[in-house]
Amino acid sequence: MLASVLARFLSHFTSFKGYRNPYYGIIVPSKLRPLWVLVEFSSLLPHYLLRRFLSLLHPVIGDRGLLDFVVWIIVTLDYPRFLSSFTGRFLARLAVKEKNVYVKADPATLLRRVVDIPPSFLAKEVACYSVLAKYYASYTIDTTSRTPMESLGELLKCLRRL
């Protein structure tokens, strides 16, 4: 939440205008990366803790997890060495414990499915997810040639195995 509010605020300043983060139209200068990672992490923490608490009571299914957060940081900050940082290593250790299902499609299909994301941003995201999913995803579902109902069926099969 804090990161979102701050990003909206910073989008009004020309020194932060850019499309590394296409959702807010900002670019965080490289000197501010460590600070921005902390801002993003502080926004993630309440969500993560709530999910962990709820998972003690019931299975929790969500579309955004730690793997997504790591990809978000790497791509929006153009920070491929994030996993070498203290915060990155900490999150990687937590992400290994999550049961991730990587839902993917080929880049051409993704470009048809999303309207407001620049192709260059999408390509970076796909590349990052493809590499990290090898280490952090329990299962991968390719939705390229599947209908939404077929994809849901595959997801349910994966969930039964987890």
Task: Name the predicted role of every residue range.
Residues 64-131:
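A glycine- and Lys/Arg-enriched "phosphate-lid" helix/loop adjacent to the NTP-binding pocket
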Residues 2-77, 82:
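ATP-dependent small-molecule kinase phosphotransfer cores
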Residues 57, 96-98, 137:
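Local beta-strand N-terminus motif with an aromatic residue
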Residues 11, 15, 44, 75, ...:
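Generic surface-pattern signal
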Residues 60, 100-102, 140:
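Short, well-ordered beta-strand core segments
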Residues 108-162:
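NTP-dependent small-molecule kinase module
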Residues 51-55, 94, 132, 162:
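Hydrophobic helix-cap positions at the C-terminus of alpha-helices
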